[in-house]
Amino acid sequence: MTQLTQSSCWQALIADAAKLPHMRDLFAQNPQRFEQMSLNACGLFLDYSKNRADETTLKLLFSLAKEAKLTEKIAAMFNGDIINTTEQRAVLHTALRSKACQDIRVDGVNIVPEVQQTLDKMAQFVDSVQTGQCKGYTGKRITDIVSIGIGGSFLGPKIVSQALRPYWKAGLNCHFVANVDASSICEKLKLLNAETTLFVMSSKSFGTQETLTNTLSAKDWFLDQGATQADIAKHFVAVTSNVTKATEFGMDADNIFPMWDWVGGRYSLWSAIGLPIALLIGMDNFRLLLDGAHQMDEHVKAAPLEQNMPVIMALLSVLYTNFHGAQSHVVLTYDHYLRGLPAYFQQLDMESNGKSVTLNGTQVDYSTGPVIWGGEGTNGQHAYHQLLHQGTALIPADFIMPLQSHNPLGEHHAQLASNCFGQTQALMQGRTFEEAMAELSQSSLNEADKTLIAKHKVMLGNKPSNTLLMDKLTPQTLGSLIALYEHRTLVQGAIWQINSFDQWGVELGKQLGNDVLARIGAAHNATELDSSSNALINRFRQGKI
């Protein structure tokens, strides 16, 4: 066993999980349970009372965090220590939402002034587009933005832009392209007018295969519409570290925005990668997004573990992953604008914590990152919620809902809220056989049929969930919410003693993909790989099965 699983705290949590009463009983025994297991922070309210935990469980979890030196690990990230040890990098996405007066250093240099300069540069560009000062090659104002990226440079801007749709500047629309599948970009280009379209290309190296391929195709389309090479500077901007390649492409050096090694892709929406967001919602709202995240940064640094929202959520996830056998976690957003968040949190969590060796290279003997999935309420209630209620797998859930709607229409929002809260109650409470029989008592069925149907209507309950509320979905509350899950991911990784900030599995996929591409384009059939890979490559070369 590893040192972690041998610890007395770990062993005590195993014993505690086996003997804890049903949540129905925990609520019955403690009328103050909700008050004791809920908290406010940074415009968010967390109810974690519907979890398989009592005072003893929580004390053990906080002890586990202290044994892991969690407070010191959180501080190390904020201080710019090299916590991404396999790539020898600091992890400072938090610096992107820092205040101008802060001093945050990488290699002895304060990086805050450069961050602020980039924000100011973004503000000038955003203002020029939104006011119509920035015009296309025929003098028409920009109406459409195409964001081209992959991974964090695609998903973050897309999901945040989608979530903040009520704040979009009138007259601007945005389209997001990531997949190298030609159908993705072709379908987008069919909707566009080259004279009024702005392309934002995001790639640290300016060489990411999918992003570069899509950008080159966009350039070809642009030139085919009647534009010239000289017109590219008015319609293409880049977020990249490789200024040379971007200028060779035809971009104006003034419209090239920086990226830094101390920001990982899945944490980059706060940087110039968020330019598409800022173009849509304006720089003032983008700064509010940053401010909400900064508030959560200050909270995770300063709040005691027992009152620390990201810490509590992370420890509860560890509880289910390691002591209750949960293999997945569902995120359920009861707000149409937040429908993309499960996919964003999926990338954030699974790319960060899908690891199987500790920081010192030891193979883990415990589960790490669970599968993250989810969707939009109430749609899921007519699909996968059935499995949550009566399936054999334990799947902890996060319910997320604003108390106020951007579209207050009739009783829509009241019905949405009633479904959200009703689901959390049903998951916790379940339905006993006796309750099912009582519901059938007035039916005309005979006793044997009543008994049979009652067995099918039993729900064990004791299914855990968190409920996250906010007054209203705003740039600030969204910033807090995303930063909450970022820090939750950090805390999980700290407990599991893994590096949450590299992604070698992703890198291997890129490497092998490039090798396969070369074989697809070779003069002869593939023969050097395994029989399956050879056959698949050769079938593709033939264009038929």
Swiss-Prot record:
Keywords: Cytoplasm, Gluconeogenesis, Glycolysis, Isomerase. It is found in: Cytoplasm. GO terms for biological process: gluconeogenesis; glucose 6-phosphate metabolic process; glycolytic process. The keyword Isomerase applies. The active site is at E351 (proton donor), H382, K510. It holds the Pfam family PGI. InterPro entries: G6P_Isomerase (IPR001672), G6P_Isomerase_C (IPR023096), Phosphoglucose_isomerase_CS (IPR018189), SIS_dom_sf (IPR046348), SIS_PGI_1 (IPR035476), SIS_PGI_2 (IPR035482). It catalyses: alpha-D-glucose 6-phosphate = beta-D-fructose 6-phosphate. GO terms for molecular function: carbohydrate derivative binding; glucose-6-phosphate isomerase activity; monosaccharide binding. Its EC number is 5.3.1.9. Pathway: Carbohydrate biosynthesis; gluconeogenesis; Carbohydrate degradation; glycolysis; D-glyceraldehyde 3-phosphate and glycerone phosphate from D-glucose: step 2/4. PROSITE patterns: P_GLUCOSE_ISOMERASE_1, P_GLUCOSE_ISOMERASE_2, P_GLUCOSE_ISOMERASE_3. It comes from the Bacteria. GO terms for cellular component: cytosol. The keyword Hydrolase does not apply. Catalyzes the reversible isomerization of glucose-6-phosphate to fructose-6-phosphate. Belongs to the GPI family. This is Glucose-6-phosphate isomerase. It comes from Shewanella denitrificans (strain OS217 / ATCC BAA-1090 / DSM 15013).
